[in-house]
Amino acid sequence: MVRAGAVGTHLPTSSLDIFGDLRKMNKRQLYYQVLNFAMIVSSALMIWKGLIVLTGSESPIVVVLSGSMEPAFHRGDLLFLTNFREDPIRAGEIVVFKVEGRDIPIVHRVIKVHEKDNGDIKFLTKGDNNEVDDRGLYKEGQNWLEKKDVVGRARGFLPYVGMVTIIMNDYPKFKYALVAVMGAYVLLKRES
């Protein structure tokens, strides 16, 4: 068995020396790698904006952050949303909504809908795993949600795929390390 650092062993340090690799690149290679990285980022942004237009939702993909919707959805499930204004809101539907004063949208089921003669709709939500409805989550004095509060309606999901997002939010250093590693990979990757 050979131990790291033992006499006569050689550990390759060139793969670990990121700045040394950057210094070895000529300006054209470095420019190409930075441009490649910028194209990846801009492509991701264009895909996101395209999804916003196609789905009608300001946030077409969301992650379930709590267990309040179990057994329908679990913490870490990735939800795909649509939000077409002409679609009526129905009891039993799962919606993602924003509440004034809260930064993070909430994923819950519509349990009651009240429609007025003029077409205005008000509705009440509740998490499947919660004992009481969501009136305690709404802003003070608000008893019902309106269509303007809806970010989207759940149309599909991928189980547990969003756990990466939860881990990155729970452990911010992991998020920065992951971004740094991906950025270094893109910058240092050389065409064969």
Swiss-Prot record:
Sequence ranges on the Lumenal membrane side: 49-192
Keyword field contains Metal-binding: no
GO function term, MF aspect, one: serine-type endopeptidase activity
Subcellular location: Endoplasmic reticulum membrane
CDD domains named in the record: S26_SPase_I (cd06530)
Positions annotated as active site in the UniProt record: 68, 108, 134
GO BP term, pick one: signal peptide processing
Gene Ontology cellular-component annotations: endoplasmic reticulum membrane; signal peptidase complex
Catalyzed reaction equations: Cleavage of hydrophobic, N-terminal signal or leader sequences from secreted and periplasmic proteins
Region (C-terminal short (CTS) helix) location: 177-188
Protein name (database record): Signal peptidase complex catalytic subunit SEC11C
